[in-house]
Amino acid sequence: MKKKKQALKVLLSVGILSSSFAFAHTSSAAPNNVLSTEKYNKEIKSPEFISGKLSGPSSQKAQDVVFHYMNTNKDKYKLGNENAQNSFKVTEVVKDPVEQATVVRLQQVYNNIPVWGSTQLAHVAKDGTLKVVSGTVAPDLDKKEKLKGQKQVDSKKAIQAAEKDLGFKPTYEKSPSSELYVYQNGSDTTYAYVVNLNFLSPEPGNYYYFVDAISGKVLDKYNTIDSVAGPKADVKQAAKPAAKPVTGTNAIGSGKGVLGDTKSLKTTLSSSTYYLQDNTRGATIYTYDAKNRTSLPGTLWTDTDNTYNATRDAAAVDAHYYAGVTYDYYKNKFNRNSYDNAGAPLKSTVHYSSGYNNAFWNGSQMVYGDGDGTTFVPLSGGLDVIGHELTHAVTERSSNLIYQYESGALNEAISDIFGTLVEYYDNRNPDWEIGEDIYTPGTSGDALRSMSNPAKYGDPDHYSKRYTGSSDNGGVHTNSGIINKAAYLLANGGTHYGVTVTGIGGDKLGKIYYRANTLYFTQSTTFSQARAGLVQAAADLYGSGSQEVISVGKSFDAVGVQ
């Protein structure tokens, strides 16, 4: 059972750098609820999270304040002979509605080539004072010999190398892409192409390959769509049917979900036909039928009387209703308009393939298999599954945590956390288990993962027990248990490894983690960096001396993350 569970817990997933354990110092609060924190990478001794009054007031643009600070501290950031303006590119500038600060997102570059996984977030107060700099740098790039040479491999050959390593000919969902990066491969730093292979057949995959631009060798790879089973026989692809939105009038229907409960459905009436198309929210919600094939999105679900009680309707009923619940949660709690915060439509496809034991976000929509009836029932029947997967989309459009090692485990944990909080929001038999409603229908009380007791399914509940191998993208579905346990303790309280945590409730848990994921976490955030970002997020929301700040720190103490 344990081996089975280890294989199956990779169900809930999305799309490289692993940082060593860091040391930190946190002192009393600086003005405006900014904690004075210094956290450095233990190996390269560069800052990972610095907060406090980092500069005086300024009338300069926020990015210029950040560049001035980094130039003043260029030795700490190990920029070598380059200045900050040549070492970082501003990729986003947004306003923080809580602190009225300007948040600047930066991408590290070398010779105008982006450095994989090396991004920074900086918070500049309304008066121009720099408050926080968070992120990971690749050090001393001007000293790396391989970066002084010329690339020998072009983009086309890099794609060919990735396809050869893949070992089979897929049916692509979109054309392969390739982009040149500076890439850290352990202690080696070189130019590498990041190749993306996105396909549905013979088994869904969204691979990222790292191909050395000098030698043409594959340095690393990972898949951001995980499958329960191994590669299957090819499922014949049908020609993509028309799946255009319809124009009509809003209607209210009803239907029975996978577990037999009745739900109200927002639909569209057009030419005497009802469609599972909800036009009433800031983002339109569409639900499609793949008809047991693998072509996406399929056909828009239709009905003649707006009553969806047939057995085959159940998966569509839940996919449609739960997508709406998840949208409402993010909109009502955080004023977020869909996963991209810009009203992107929420598309779901059910009855994907035949007996398919998986659900995934493919970068643009949700996809649900029917399960084989023994391991899983239709996977859209789990609200926490839908909340989990759509949260991957939120993360992709905010921190964009790389789906490997600690950043990948943090990515998974955030999806588990918000999948659970969406379940509590709808108040439909909520709990701190993941996938319990759709997993092993013949076994009562079973689930994929437990946030309250990760060890129940073989996952670590303390940093000292973390998985250190390379399987499962470096243990993203395993080490997520450490963050899951911290989150559970933060919401509910309890004593773990001799550390007592005062619970603050699920609502505050969500606010703190959402703020950190959107305004403090960067692509390569480690558990230690996450702690610093979450503590500061709590200080922003509730005050530097608040119980919430204390509880966040204690929750990480309890799982051994400093």
Swiss-Prot record:
Q: Where does Ca(2+) 4 bind?
A: 439-440, 446
Signal sequence residues = 1-24
The UniProt family comment states:
Belongs to the peptidase M4 family.
Organism lineage reads as: Bacteria, Bacillati, Bacillota, Bacilli, Bacillales
Q: Which residues form a coiled coil?
A: none
**Organism, as annotated:** Priestia megaterium (strain DSM 319 / IMG 1521)
| Cofactors that this protein relies on | Ca(2+); Zn(2+)
Q: What is this protein called?
A: Bacillolysin
Briefly, what is this protein's role?
Extracellular zinc metalloprotease.
Instruction: Cite the binding residues for Zn(2+).
Output: 388, 392, 412
